[in-house]
Amino acid sequence: MMYFGYGSNLDWNDWKGYCERNGRSPDGLIEIEPAWILGYNLKFHYHSKGRKGGAADVVPLNHYHATPGALFELDEDTWKTMNMKEGTRGGYYEPKEVLVVRQSGELITALTYVVCEDKIKQQYTKPSPEYEQLIRNGLANRGLPDTGLDHSMNDAWDHHVIEHLFVYGTLMGGEVRHGELSPYIESIEEGSMQGILYDLDYYPGIKTGEGIVHGELIKMNDVESCLTNMDSIEGFYGYESKNSLYQRTIVPIQTKHGLQWAWTYVYSGHVEENTRIDSGRWKQP
């Protein structure tokens, strides 16, 4: 079974310590990779006696938001241990099925834990420095941003964590649709992502796979307005739709300044192998 962790379970020693104190084996928690939960942001509005302060929760917003964490696989016995640790019997946290983005950009469903409604406080509940550091270290160790943690620590939990968009085709500078993106550009730089680029006649499409696709990384000045317009251009009708031409997802982008997580669009339709662009570049030098 697949599990998405975003709080203290990003720290192996915290998990191992709990298991040892309770006579359980920690070995059934197998980490797969860094991942993102779609449509949720991190929030501190629950006081944990055990943590001596606020404990993390993820709360739903809309599909312009996402929270980083890690994807794990758990065996049946480890699920029982996880339920114990999360206090499901006592009504502290409860499991919830969510949509998760894997490192490749693939979307899957997994379970996570959210705070039970009657344990939620209306005000910001500050976490202890030790608990905050567990999460911060867990994110840093996986190359994930702590922007959402910083927002939550300042009671600005509903701010956007991902403010970048990766484009690789007709939205790039000098291309036919760049004018529709240009009003939303705060900054722009070259970047690349893992994937395979295909020529779909008048525009390209990415599929996940072993390869490198080159493009441009845009920092958006208005995330929701930009993505709303780009969704329309790319034929993305929402994560519940099976009729989208492209799927909006999250991927790591390599730039000369380092790694940056960004939204991008991957093609949903069928492609012929002979349409692959081996150079990974739509705009040739």
Listing of model-derived features with the role each one plays in the protein:
Residues M1-P285:
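A glycine-rich, hydrophobic/aromatic-adjacent loop/helix-cap motif
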